[in-house]
């Protein structure tokens, strides 16, 4: 399950999305996430589904590879659905003791699960089609106006990029530690959910030690390369907008306008 996490990983390809400026993809991700909270009913669902399907198709990332990232959050999806299903007041359809399933609860559970699923998939498209270095450059360029009010944009972008880069590293490290403990007789599969959670506790100490060690190695490597922040730094490959980026911005504007118009029409 740990190896199924796709957020933070990069999938090499020569797709249209891979070639886009990272600032365009950052804006596209923001627009798509916002659109998830605008849609209502079947028409809105169809609009955001088409938007997501279009992004996945253009990315040339295999759909099976994209969807496997949902396995790691399956428990969160189930709990989200159950909470909304049983705790949303409305017209009762069925009851199980103190728990009641309502029509509003069914709709709320379905919408929340779909939104969370699409949120993860949409965010995964960004990281799967953008290298960490390009993502850092894109964030820095996009947030550059904040420099005027004293925000250390370069450092913030670097921290976000490192955090994303550490996700697959920590997942791989956790997998190694689990295999080592399984070889020593540890059991992570048997028992109920609470017992499985308790069995994971012994992983925390070696995982934290490994994380601190890797962070220290990274800090030493950055110091050895005389890294001292963004002041005076130049780029080997500076970001530059091309015609396809302008076309992508127009598509984003058309998509977001369509979602807002659809919501207003269905109100």
Regions found by a protein language model. Give the residues of each.
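Interfacial helix-loop-helix linkers and transmembrane-helix boundary segments
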Residues: 46, 62-70
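Alpha-helical transmembrane segments and their membrane-interface exit regions
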Residues: 51-61, 76-79
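Membrane-helix interfacial "entry" motifs
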Residues: 14, 37, 60-65, 96, ...
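Loop-to-transmembrane-helix entry motif
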Residues: 69-73, 77, 113, 117-120, ...
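Transmembrane alpha-helix interface motif
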Residues: 1-44, 48-57, 141-151, 155-158, ...
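Juxtamembrane/interface alpha-helical elements of multi-pass membrane proteins
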Residues: 73-186
